[in-house]
C-alpha cells in the first residue's frame, strides 16, 4: 500500500511499546485489539494501524 503516514507509524509503535504482548501475526486479531485499546472512529485508520502492527510483529518474528 505504500509508505504509511507518520501518525500511523507513531501510533502503532506506541501501541506496540505499551501492549506488545497483546498483538499477534494475525491482522483480524490485531484489528480487534486496536479497537479495544483505542478510541478511533475511522475504520480506515484503525485498519491501517492494525496492518502496520501486524507487519512489525511478523518482521520481528523472522529475525
From Swiss-Prot:
Keyword field: Ribonucleoprotein, Ribosomal protein
Keyword Methyltransferase: no
Biological processes, Gene Ontology terms: translation
Transit peptide keyword on record: no
PROSITE patterns in the cross-refs: RIBOSOMAL_S17E
Gene3D superfamilies for the chain: Ribosomal protein S17e-like
GO MF: structural constituent of ribosome
Cellular component annotations (GO), alphabetically ordered: cytosol; ribonucleoprotein complex; ribosome
InterPro entries assigned: Ribosomal_eS17, Ribosomal_eS17_CS, Ribosomal_eS17_sf
Positions in coiled-coil regions: none
Lineage top rank: taxon: Archaea
Family matches, as NCBIfam families: PRK01151.1 (NF002242)
Family: Belongs to the eukaryotic ribosomal protein eS17 family.
Name of the featured protein: Small ribosomal subunit protein eS17
Organism: Methanosphaerula palustris (strain ATCC BAA-1556 / DSM 19958 / E1-9c)
